[in-house]
Amino acid sequence: MNIKDKDKLKEIFQIFKEDDIIEIGEKIIGIGGFGSVTEVKTKNGKYFAGKLIKSKKTDEIEFISEFKNKNIVQTIKIYNKSFKGENYSLILMEKAILKDLTTLNQNLFKGLLKIIIDTPFEGIVGDNLIRFYARQIIDGLESIDRNDICHFDIKTDNLLIFIRMKIKLSDFSLLKQLKNKEKGNKTNEVEIPGGTPGYLSPEYYQEKKRKRKVPFNVAKKQDYFAFGSTLFYLKYREEMLPYNEYDDDLMTSDYIIDLLQRAVDLIQSKEILSDKDFKTFLCSLINYDPNERPNFEEIYRNKWVNKNVQEINKIYAINSQNEEKLIMELNKSDFLITKKNELKKSDNKFIFDYNKSK
């Protein structure tokens, strides 16, 4: 739903006031191409996220209403209403208390997370913390992979953070069910519906002004590629594939492959101080050839992914007292509203420079 007028959005949101919804927030939390989100309060005093979409977007509604997984944002209830001849759905979902991984990653160096983490930070994000995130993302990916679904928009903005640093996948507006339910047969090809520049794989750009149809097994590799881009950003606080929004003609398959090769060269260079197993795993995920990327079983069993599991779970367990302290700190800080472009490059200990690898 591509409505950018916040006043119109607020007007549409208000028609969903029901007996069990007593308050719909004035502040629009997020506006996307397929939906907008605000805060909703129910009569029992609980707060949820309310996502407004046009009702014809049935794939997302069907999926989220049926699917249950600890690393997928859960749907509480779906309301349907008409407004000026258009049908809308309000999806009531659990609300992320710490927003998303983009916001969290931007603030790792501001000291706020010392409240919840028992070990000190050193500049770039440590492998244990990245692994802690990665294992939860993998658990979410496994559940949608097993059900023959592609998310097609995995990125840090769509990875929400809940109590005890639990990561949950959100925003299934681009999902594709890779199975014909009526015939019971898997499709041979699926069209990549789009996604977010910087997280889109080279196969998306293979044809110009195109319908980007790829084989079913390749489609799943798009989610794994985006997972690799996510790990890259979490680790190095840099976009892996800088996007030229003013010249879409530059975004060709060859251009993306060239950027990827430079990224791989830099990751593998000695000046990048990362765990060798992490480098190998990351480079496999962002391979420009989808057939060379690991399948899910290989991801799940990867050596780096399975390092220090018990230690990680112990280190990042948060008790109730610390959770309350964390929330208090967040409420009186700019943690939840920090914009990406406000960060200074000097905040990073390491900056990727693609020119070095030319």
Report each predicted region and the residues it spans.
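Conserved HxN/HPN-centered segment at the entrance to the catalytic loop
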Residues: 68-79
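Catalytic-loop of the protein kinase fold
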Residues: 145-162
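Protein kinase glycine-rich loop
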Residues: 26-32, 37
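Conserved short submotifs of the Hanks-type protein kinase catalytic core
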Residues: 86-100
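Terminal C-lobe "cap" of eukaryotic-type protein kinase domains
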Residues: 287-312
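Activation segment/activation loop of eukaryotic-type protein kinase catalytic domains
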Residues: 162-199, 207
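Activation segment signature within eukaryotic-like protein kinase domains
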Residues: 133-134
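Conserved C-lobe activation region of Hanks-type protein kinase-like domains
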Residues: 207-225, 229-268
